[in-house]
């Protein structure tokens, strides 16, 4: 029986060798291999295009999200600072109002007029405060180049170094944005 098994094994080996050597099988195998290689190349190419398209899509999504965020921030800033133009136009009139109120009243009529001006001034400031306008505090404070504009320097032992000694023109802020810096004299 062992001889029979050995004989069958040898026949199978010979048949395999003959099949491998026949020209028809070798052509089919080469064609199959080249067709498989072409298909693999197509798969690789399509995979690369898919990866590129996915990356482009993700970048476009991120760009769009950034755009939406910028538009939202711009919209909020426009809403927050909508009164800036109006306030900038009103400030010179407010300065003139304050200068007019510094006049000394000598008679009753002038005193009455000044009281009326003070009431109008107070109402104007209240309306500006409702919109978020604040006066920038200056005298006695440390000089801050973001809020103060130094137009003079002086040496005064009564004040700390770099402190605001005198204010020549009031400064104003709208919420957290400086509309006009205070014009001040600074101690060295």
From Swiss-Prot:
The record, for InterPro entries, names: GrpE, GrpE_coiled_coil, GrpE_head
Where are the residues of the annotated region Disordered? 1-31
Q: Keyword Hydrolase on this protein?
A: no
**Recorded GO CC terms:** cytoplasm
Q: Which GO terms describe its molecular function?
A: adenyl-nucleotide exchange factor activity; protein homodimerization activity; protein-folding chaperone binding; unfolded protein binding
Out of the domains of life, which is the source? Answer: Bacteria
How does the record describe its quaternary structure? Homodimer.
Q: Which protein, by its recorded name, is this?
A: Protein GrpE
* Species this protein is from: Bacillus anthracis
The UniProt gene name for this protein comes to grpE
């Amino acid at each position: 029986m062992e001889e029979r098994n050995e004989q069958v094994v040898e026949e199978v080996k010979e048949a395999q060798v003959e099949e491998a050597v026949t020209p028809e099988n070798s052509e089919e195998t080469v064609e199959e291999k080249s067709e498989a290689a072409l298909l693999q190349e197509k798969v690789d190419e399509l995979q690369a295009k898919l990866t590129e398209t996915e990356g482009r899509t993700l970048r476009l999504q991120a760009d769009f999200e950034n755009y939406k965020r910028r538009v939202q921030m711009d919209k909020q800033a426009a809403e927050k600072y909508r009164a800036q133009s109006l306030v900038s136009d009103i400030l010179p009139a407010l300065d003139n109002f304050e200068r007019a109120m510094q006049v000394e009243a000598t008679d009753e009529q002038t005193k009455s007029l000044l009281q009326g001006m003070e009431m109008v001034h107070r109402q104007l400031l209240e309306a500006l405060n409702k919109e978020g306008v604040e006066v920038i505090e200056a005298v006695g404070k440390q000089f801050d180049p973001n809020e103060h504009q130094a137009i003079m320097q002086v040496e005064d032992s009564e004040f700390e170094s770099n402190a605001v000694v005198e204010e020549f023109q009031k400064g104003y802020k709208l919420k957290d944005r400086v509309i006009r810096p205070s014009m001040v004299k600074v101690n060295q």
